Amino acid sequence: MGLLLVIVLVTLVFKATGTAGRSFGRLQDELQLQEARRHILAQLEKTVCYDAQSVRLQDDGKISCRMLEGCKQVTVYSDKQGIYQRTRTNKGTGVNPVSLEEVGVFGWQVRRCSPQMLCVSFDLYRNGRSMRVMQYFICYSARITDDA
């Protein structure tokens, strides 16, 4: 009888910790998606809204910015389930990730809403969980043009 009680208690404990573990995993995934969203939007806001002198939306979804800081060109684009920023200066070119490595980015779209307003939308994915992101940016120092 005592052995049966121990087996039942151990089974209940394992089920409870398994459920708690899965819930904790889902919570971690949700927090990671929120952090990725915040990080991407903050980087885009800094680049497009504050530091750009001109913004050009390319047909392939790239955002090309000429920066207030002289002789600097920044292009933001989506590639291989991530968002990247290519920076060109007189001294050379470099590429840095804007998105977090642990979170996939899909469905990247950009469109001009007005001469100074830009809409960016994309989906974030992590371990089967997803989040749709859509944000409007007002370019304070730049005018937005489209490829025609």
Model-assigned labels for residue ranges:
Residues C49, G82-R86, S141:
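Short, cationic motifs built from Arg/Lys/His that form the positively charged side of catalytic pockets
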Residues T17, F24, Q43-K46, V74-Q81:
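Broad hydrophobic/π-residue packing in well-ordered secondary structure
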Residues H39-D60:
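Alpha-helix exit/C-cap motif
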Residues M1-A42:
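Aliphatic-rich helix starts adjacent to a transmembrane/signal segment
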Residues M134-A148:
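Short, low-complexity, Pro/Ser/Thr/Gly-rich segments in the mature regions of secreted, periplasmic
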Residues S54-C119, R129-R132, D147-A148:
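Type IV pilin-like appendage domain
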Residues D123-N127:
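Beta-strand-rich extracellular modules
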